[in-house]
């Protein structure tokens, strides 16, 4: 049975947690119904990431993404994808305290069909996570390289290169697990500590730039399909030269129009 026909039921957190130590979790970003529909039969998880602020709106970071933006794109993704577990990124400033976080998480649940919300931060977010999970919100954690902290960190820096960082990462992971996160994203973490975290906690880890030992992997679709050639992170594998292919198609279309080859008789009404 092909991957396209194998999955028919909505994937839940229980399904994903049952995959730990048995089967890798396949995750990808999406921001609209068109791509979500294409990804639907293949992936387990779709993240409506605040990365859309960079890939869709050409911003330098994720910080100006708004809750309204995330709601709009989550609704679109949910219209296209019916099977995957859909996670909505909580944008910068939308979970600055427990009251704000709960209000905005409830708004995501009420206005979209998202399965879960994702927030960045370590053990300092444990109490907030507990508050959300007590109200029935599924929370996905995110530690390591955290894009919402890029200005504080002075850039996008890999974590876990020394013993102090490794200790903090493990403490963060254990605290978040205890607080109730259902999944944990490990971004930009050195492979050895990502492996340790994955072994130590009972919930699945989803890696991005954190080595092959995580319970699953996620990539930004526009990176893996080759739509950005100005910068490519080390961890990205391009499976398609998307930008090149699309530009060639548009060039062919433009040439056909200029030369009067499009539309032809079969493409015209009489």
Swiss-Prot record:
InterPro entries: Pantoate_hydroxy_MeTrfase, Pyrv/PenolPyrv_kinase-like_dom, Pyrv_kinase-like_dom_sf. It catalyses: 3-methyl-2-oxobutanoate + (6R)-5,10-methylene-5,6,7,8-tetrahydrofolate + H2O = 2-dehydropantoate + (6S)-5,6,7,8-tetrahydrofolate. It comes from the Bacteria. It is found in: Cytoplasm. Keywords: Cytoplasm, Magnesium, Metal-binding, Pantothenate biosynthesis, Transferase. Its EC number is 2.1.2.11. GO terms for molecular function: 3-methyl-2-oxobutanoate hydroxymethyltransferase activity; magnesium ion binding. Pathway: Cofactor biosynthesis; (R)-pantothenate biosynthesis; (R)-pantoate from 3-methyl-2-oxobutanoate: step 1/2. 3-methyl-2-oxobutanoate binds at residues 50-51, 89, 118. Its cofactor is Mg(2+). Binds 1 Mg(2+) ion per subunit. Mg(2+) binds at residues 50, 89, 120. GO terms for cellular component: cytoplasm. The keyword Transferase applies. One of its GO terms (biological process) is pantothenate biosynthetic process. The active site is at 187 (proton acceptor). Belongs to the PanB family. Homodecamer; pentamer of dimers. Catalyzes the reversible reaction in which hydroxymethyl group from 5,10-methylenetetrahydrofolate is transferred onto alpha-ketoisovalerate to form ketopantoate. HAMAP family: PanB. This is 3-methyl-2-oxobutanoate hydroxymethyltransferase. It comes from Helicobacter acinonychis (strain Sheeba). The gene is panB.
